Amino acid sequence: MTSPRTRQALRHISFFIMGCAGMISAHAHAQISAPPIVQTSQGAVSGKLISGTRAYLGIPYAAPPVGELRWQSPQPPARWSGTRDGSAFGARCAQPLSALSPESANEDCLFLNVYAPEGMGRNKLPVMVWIHGGAFLSGSAAEYDMTKLAQKAQAVVVSINYRLGAFGSLRQPELVAQSTSSNLGLQDQQAALRWVGSQIGKFGGDASRVTLFGHSAGSASVCLHMVSPQSKGLFHRAIMQSGACHLLTATPPAAMQAQTVSLGVKLGCPEGRGQLACMRQKPAADVMRQSVPNGNEVNGVDIRWTPVQDGITVP
C-alpha cells in the first residue's frame, strides 16, 4: 500500500510522461503536416500540405523586372541562402482593377507555384503548366487552386505569373532597335518553362512530359508557343481552352508602336531618343494608369496591349 506522498509523486510522473508523449506526438504531426524541403538550383524551398497535395508557392523563376530590367527579356533569378518559405503566393503582376482581380502596381511578380500529389512513388509524374487568362491585362496564378487537379491527374502542376498590360506587351522604338522582343509576357512564360525543364524533377515531375495549357489569353499564349521558335523543346503537349492566335491581329506592330510612343508622351517622356530611359524612371502605378483602356476595346475586352508579330518571339 502506497503512502499519499508516493501516490502524489506517481501522479506527477504520469503527467510528465503524458506531457512528453503529447510533445512527441505534436512533433511527429508537425513533421508529417509539411512536405519535404526541396533543394533547387536557386536554394532550398519549403512548402505546405493542402488537402493531401504538396504545394510550393511563390518561387521566383526570373529576376524582378524592375529598374533597368523593366521592358527587358527576363533574366535568371538570384540564389538565396537558408530555406525560402513557400507557403504563400507571390505578388500578382501590375494590373488595373477588374471584376476578378484587385489593382496591383507590383512589378516584382515573376513567381510560379508547384503542386504535387502526396504519396508519390519513385516514378516521375507528368507535368502540367497552367497559363492564366485575363486579356493579357489582368489575372494571376493565385486565382486558381491546382490541388485537386494534381491529385486527380496524378501530375505535378505548375501555375505561373507573367507580365501584363504595357509591362508585358509594347513596341518602343529604342527596344526595337536593340532587337528586344515586343512580347515580354510571352518571354516570361518561356522562362518559366525553362525553369520547369531544369527544376521540376526535384519536385517529382518528368521534364520530358510537359503539357502546356491555359484559357482565354492563356490559351492564346499556348497557341503562340506552338509556333514560336523560342518555345521549341520547352513543352511536348498543348491544351487550348477558349482562345487562339487570331485574336491578336487586333493590334498590328505599327499600331502597337504608335500607342507605346503615345504612352511615353502621356508619362511626360518626349518622343525620340531617351524616351525609354525616361519611361523606366516612372512609377509602375503611373505606367499602369496611363495605359488602361480608353475606348480601345473589342466586345468589351481591351486589346491594346496584346502580343504582336515581332519576328523574335512571334514569327
Spans of model-derived segments:
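Bacterial N-terminal signal peptides
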Residues: 13-23
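Alpha/beta-hydrolase-fold catalytic nucleophile elbow
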Residues: 161, 213, 228, 239-242
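Non-catalytic accessory segments of hydrolases
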Residues: 28-186, 207, 301
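N-terminal secretory signal peptides that target proteins for export/translocation
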Residues: 1-9
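Alpha/beta-hydrolase active-site loop
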Residues: 109, 179-201, 258
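Alpha/beta-hydrolase fold nucleophile elbow
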Residues: 204-215
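Substrate-access "cap/lid" subdomains that shape
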Residues: 98, 198, 232, 241-315
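Short glycine-enriched nucleophile-adjacent loop
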Residues: 219-230
